[in-house]
Amino acid sequence: MNNYLALFDNNMIQARSLSTIYINLRDNVHIEDKYISNLLKAQLVNIVSAFDMFLHGIVKKGVIEIFNKTRKETSKFQSFSFQAKTILRLLEVMSPNFIPSSSDEITDVILEKELSRQLSFMSFQSPDKVTDALSLIWNEQHKIQVLSDKMEISGSNINEKANNLKQKLTTIIQRRNQIAHEGDIEPTTQLPRSIELLDVELATDFIYALAHAVFDAVTAADCYS
């Protein structure tokens, strides 16, 4: 799973560069904010995409690990279904006498393609979608509570911390959706919504910390057989 975390980190570095460009254009070139604020909006969209891509990657990897008996099964995995043709193909390539003639005839490759097909219809962004996806590979019953503790989210108790995590993530996703799906136009005024550099920086830090907390949780020793 290290490769997926490294890819996520690289995507986040690229996303952060947009606010760096924004600051340079604002402070050194003195371009008005209305002409460059789309850089910040693009960064917000990109960090959510990076997180979604990261989750898709580790879920696929985790399911393959379960199939290979190196990761502990979860109840959600036990109810996960594959197409009949995929099952037949797996049985064929797993036969002791089968000799693969290409990389497409390797168990892990077949599984990854099938998982990519199934998961491509899903987005792992909102708190409920995130926990549902992680249930395929992580048996923890109180996922948000564990993640909020790892991230040191503020709150007077573990449930308040969990609620604060969910609220922060929901706010980021809602703002992302306004940009990506609504043209980021305020319905009443028909003018573009404003966006603040600090808000984008905080959102970026939050998504980065969340992904790393997820990685630490799903790669813990007790997740493996």
Regions found by a protein language model. Give the residues of each.
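Charged alpha-helical initiation segments
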Residues: 1-45, 57-64, 68-79
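Polyanionic, low-complexity intrinsically disordered segments
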Residues: 2-20, 142-225
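Hydrophobic aliphatic residue packing
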Residues: 45-48, 207
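Helix-loop junctions and short alpha-helical segments
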Residues: 47, 59-159
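Extended alpha-helical coiled-coil scaffold domains characteristic of the BAR superfamily
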Residues: 49-53
